[in-house]
C-alpha cells in the first residue's frame, strides 16, 4: 500500500471540560488536544489502517513533544517533522456546542 503524506500546520486546541463555556471554566482547567486539517487527515487514514506521514515544522519544547507522541500513538509517521529552536505552536480555543447553542472557535 502507498503512503499518504500530508503537509500542514498542527495547532494546540484548548477547550473547557464538557460543554462548559470559558466564563464557567476559567479560572480553572482547559483540556489541550492537537489538531489541524492535515494532521487530522493523516490520523484518520492511519486509524483506518493506512500508512501516513505528516510533514511540518514546530518548535522543540515539551508541549510539541507531547504532540509528537500523540501522533505516533495514532500510527502517524513523524520522522519528517522538523523541530526548530524558533517559532511557536499555534493555539485556538473551542467551546463545544450544547443543544441549541453552536460551538464557538476563537483564534
Model-inferred region functions:
Residues 4, 31-33, 55, 86:
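Short glycine- and Lys/Arg-enriched binding-loop motifs that mark or flank ligand-binding interfaces
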Amino acid at each position: 500500500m502507498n503512503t499518504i503524506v500530508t503537509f500542514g500546520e498542527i495547532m494546540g486546541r484548548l477547550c473547557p471540560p464538557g460543554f462548559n463555556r470559558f466564563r464557567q471554566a476559567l479560572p480553572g482547567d482547559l483540556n489541550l488536544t492537537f489538531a489541524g486539517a492535515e494532521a487530522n487527515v493523516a490520523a484518520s487514514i492511519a486509524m483506518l489502517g493506512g500508512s501516513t506521514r505528516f510533514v511540518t515544522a514546530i518548535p522543540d519544547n515539551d508541549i510539541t513533544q507531547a504532540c509528537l507522541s500523540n501522533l505516533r500513538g495514532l500510527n502517524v509517521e513523524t520522522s519528517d517533522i522538523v523541530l526548530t529552536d524558533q517559532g511557536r505552536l499555534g493555539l485556538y480555543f473551542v467551546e463545544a456546542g450544547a443543544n441549541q447553542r453552536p460551538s464557538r472557535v476563537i483564534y
